[in-house]
């Protein structure tokens, strides 16, 4: 028989840097999960993606065991890395902070494809372009 799920915890943690301090500790402590076991496993699984923020969905079962799924980094994080900027524009409609090429947008869309509910790569590109526009990043061909 399948184990009964008691909680699903969603977090965004820097790759390879999970530790028992907030926000990880309190979120998992409430669910009764072995925090160190999660941190070690997460850090091992994301060591190759250093510098990126990784969304993770932790499923906690009745016997306090857990499984987790890592997702692709948020589009905004990937766009900031591609444009080489620290943060997006405070007023994206007035001042633009960076410019990136359309092929870079395609690359990000291809990376995000498993987590997006887009039918085609073009639809995924439009989603990423929308995120870029809202951050004050200009896309050029």
Curated annotation (Swiss-Prot):
The UniProt keywords, alphabetically, are: Methylation, Ribonucleoprotein, Ribosomal protein, RNA-binding, rRNA-binding
Identify one Gene Ontology CC term for this UniProt entry.
cytosolic large ribosomal subunit
One function term, GO molecular function aspect: structural constituent of ribosome
Give a short account of its post-translational modification.
One or more lysine residues are methylated.
* Domain of life according to the entry: Bacteria
InterPro entries named among the record's database cross-references: Ribosomal_uL11, Ribosomal_uL11_bac-typ, Ribosomal_uL11_C, Ribosomal_uL11_C_sf, Ribosomal_uL11_CS, Ribosomal_uL11_N, Ribosomal_uL11_N_sf
Q: One matching Pfam family, short form?
A: Ribosomal_L11
Membrane-spanning intervals of the chain: none
**Gene3D superfamilies membership:** Ribosomal protein L11, C-terminal domain (1.10.10.250), Ribosomal protein L11/L12, N-terminal domain (3.30.1550.10)
Query: Could you tell me what this protein does?
Result: Forms part of the ribosomal stalk which helps the ribosome interact with GTP-bound translation factors.
Its family remark reads: Belongs to the universal ribosomal protein uL11 family.
Q: How does it assemble?
A: Part of the ribosomal stalk of the 50S ribosomal subunit. Interacts with L10 and the large rRNA to form the base of the stalk. L10 forms an elongated spine to which L12 dimers bind in a sequential fashion forming a multimeric L10(L12)X complex.
Q: What is this protein called?
A: Large ribosomal subunit protein uL11
What is the source species? Geobacillus sp. (strain WCH70)
Q: Which gene encodes it?
A: rplK
